[in-house]
Structure formats: C-alpha cells, structure tokens
Amino acid sequence: MAATAACASLLLAACVPGLSDDAGLYFGRNDGSVPMAERQTVEVYISDTAPRYAGIIEDVAREAGGVLGTDGDSRYGGCTTQDEADVDIAWAALDVALIDYDDLRRIVWEGAQRNGFAYSATPDYSGKNNRRSVAVGDEDGNLVVFTHLEGSGFINISFHSGCMLPTHTYDLDTPYKQLPLPSVEEMFPNLRIVDAFDENSNLNPELSSQSGAQSGTQSGS
C-alpha cells in the first residue's frame, strides 16, 4: 500500500514516506480479501509467509535487547466460516522489552515495505496502560499486532494467520493438526527465548526495558 501520512501529524522526528496512522488499514483476522481457494496453504504459510513475519518480530526483539518472552502455546483453530476444512493458526503470545514507540513504528514499517505487507498504526494513547499499537498484515488475513504497553513496561505481540486450507487437495481423512507447527525456538533461533511471566504473573526481569538493552542476543532458553 502506498498511503502517505501528513507530516504534521507524525510522532516521528522526520516524515517517513508511506507511513500511515490509518487504523482502517488493518487486516482483521480471517478477513482477508483473497478468495479461500486462491490463498496459500498451511504448508506454504509455515514455510514462506510466517518466517517473513517472524523476521519483523525478530527485528523488534533485537532492538529491545534480543530477548523474546513466550506465554502459552501455538495452536490450530477453526475459522469463523465454520467450514470444517478451513483452519487458522494462533501462534504463542510473545512479549519483548519496551522500546520507544517511534522506533517500533519505524522498524515495523521498514519490515512491511521490505515484504510487501500492509502497515497501520494507532499512535494515540488508550487505556490505563497507555496502550498504542502497530500492525502489519496482508490480503490473506495474516496479521501481527505489536501492542506498546507503556504503563506495563513491555510490548505484547499477537501473531495470527488468516483462514486457509491445509492443502489445495484437502483430505478429511488427514487431520490438519498432523501438520506440525514449528516451535518458538525454531522460528527465532537467534533470540534468547524465556517465559514471559512467572507463576504469579510477574513480568520476567529479562523483559524489562532496563535489562533488555543489556541482554544481547542468544539462542536457546
């Protein structure tokens, strides 16, 4: 997309061509404009598309110190179409240390431009945590939302696919859940993977903005 924001409304220090704050540019989950039969299959999504979104997430995580927190598991789900063949993927919730919102916007925008994805931002504060967000998506309904929680001190990352078919020759006798999902460690081998929260729901100290910048990038948990 080639929407251009008015420089006077930008929070960035300099006007970035193509940067838009139009929340209407979001691609909602399962709301892709491409007909189901023409969308990528799960196999193509996992091998090609998901890694490109993961690259943008990694860029943000590196800026935040190279530590990526996880909360929950990645899973397959049924789509809102209620067609038994349609599936989507909700990846594990991810969190990184807080970075400057303008830096977050710029990194995500650059990743969107590099990959041909759509970009959107909501720069106005909302809620008690001073929430702001940045999102990147595509016409297949795939979506990654970075929620900048200034009041909580971290960035939450929601990573979802759009609706799709396991294969273009889907066989109901071959359950889609037999298609393995890569682990967070496999998707982000260059980042240090940690539990985002402890058993008391306290944020991992490695994800605090103070420690994140000093952690460096390491593989493994």
Regions found by a protein language model. Name each.
Residues 16-56, 122-221:
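An acidic-aromatic pocket/loop used at catalytic or ligand-binding sites
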Residues 58-79:
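Short, solvent-exposed beta-alpha or beta-beta edge segments that form flexible loop/patches at the rim
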Residues 11-14:
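C-terminal motif of bacterial Sec signal peptides marking the signal peptidase cleavage site
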